[in-house]
């Protein structure tokens, strides 16, 4: 990718935001992702990395390469979300098999990009624009993405709790300097439910920050 920097720059010119997704540990993701990120970041583009770490059965050598690639990528992105493939077993409703394991990992990467893109592109009652997202994600370092869903009584509160304690990521909401909250629901959701969910998340990250400082 080093020899293709000019081509990469030409392809990225005019972009406001770039997502770099990769499975770390292999040659392409580990080697190329940091180069693409460097070019994008140097162009002043908001650069977000969403990457996966190998399954444990892929071996220590691949995990070592992944850790090195993640460290290199972190130097050139504004925000970096790292998803350990091993944790997919903790959230999957189905049995993770050798055949579908890598497809599940790809789906998580796709969902990460779609979730962040939807904040800007999908109309909502309270709309966020690109400036809002940029103010949170610019030069943020490691980022945490939590997703929760629930039904029935207390659904908003239960979904918020699930998002805060999502087992998918190694990071936590502790120490966060900013939070973007996206609530998707049926049209009849009550204002109280929204306030409960947002309040729970806000209190959680500010409380944890206070304990860390």
Regions found by a protein language model. Give the residues of each.
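Tubulin/FtsZ superfamily GTPase core signature
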Residues: 1-212
């Amino acid at each position: 990718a080093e020899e293709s920097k000019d081509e990469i720059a030409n392809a990225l010119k005019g972009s406001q935001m770039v997502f770099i997704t990769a499975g770390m540990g292999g040659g392409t993701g580990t080697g190329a992702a940091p180069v693409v990120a460097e070019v994008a970041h140097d162009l002043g583009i908001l650069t977000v990395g969403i990457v996966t770490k190998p399954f444990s059965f892929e071996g220590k050598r691949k995990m070592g390469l992944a850790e090195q690639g993640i460290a290199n990528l972190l130097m050139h992105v504004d925000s970096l979300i790292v998803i350990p493939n091993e944790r997919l077993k903790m959230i999957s409703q189905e049995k993770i098999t050798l055949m579908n394991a890598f497809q599940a990992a790809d789906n998580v990467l796709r969902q990460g990009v779609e979730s962040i893109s939807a904040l800007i592109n999908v109309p909502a009652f309270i709309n966020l624009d690109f400036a809002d997202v940029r103010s949170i994600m610019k030069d943020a370092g490691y980022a945490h993405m939590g997703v929760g869903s629930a039904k029935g009584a207390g659904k908003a509160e239960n979904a918020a709790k699930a998002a805060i304690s999502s087992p998918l990521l190694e990071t936590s909401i502790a120490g966060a300097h900013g939070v973007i909250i996206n609530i998707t629901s049926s049209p009849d959701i009550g204002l109280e439910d929204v306030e409960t969910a947002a309040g729970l998340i806000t209190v959680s990250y500010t409380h944890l920050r206070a304990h860390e400082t």
